Design a protein with these regions (language model features):
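HAD-like aspartate-dependent phosphatase fold
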Residues: 1-147
Length: 147
């Protein structure tokens, strides 16, 4: 069940007198969620016939749909290739996942490090999909001290 992102939700942002990329309203999150091995069985691109019958994870379905209903943006970001878009959309819809968009072609192999000018948070899926909790962890950042 896809729903177009409404541009009216985005808030204009100005820095140093110039308009920059807009931001979501306070409290609204952009969830970027993997598919294979995260919300359902881990199926490689080399075996697309298995994508149709892959099992979904009920806890992921419940949590993601709750986030959607709370007004957060749900985007599935997968390493599946563009030719697998239809089977992927059909599978998401068949299992009742609510989402706004689907991005194909995420690099394969893991060990991701996302660099962005907006706040980025990452959560590694370890077999249990629940609401998120706060936890202090060690992270890698750019050295922004003046030399």
């Amino acid at each position: 069940m896809t729903k177009k992102e409404e541009n009216t939700d985005l808030k204009k942002k100005v820095e140093n007198g110039k308009i920059v990329s807009p931001v979501l309203p306070k409290g609204v999150k952009n969830y970027l969620i993997d598919i294979d091995g995260t919300i359902g069985d881990d199926i490689p691109n080399e075996e697309p016939d298995r994508m149709v019958t892959a099992k979904h994870y009920p806890d992921a379905l419940k949590t993601i749909n709750n986030w959607y209903d709370e007004g957060h943006i749900i985007c599935f970001f997968t390493s599946r290739v563009e030719s697998h878009r239809k089977v992927t959309q059909d599978w998401l819809n068949k299992h009742g996942f609510k989402f706004h968009s689907l991005l194909m072609g995420k690099p394969r192999g893991g060990n991701y490090h996302w660099i962005d000018n907006h706040l980025v948070k990452a959560t590694k899926y370890n077999g249990k999909f629940t609401d998120l909790i706060e936890k202090e962890v060690k992270i890698e950042v750019f050295d922004d001290t003046d030399n």
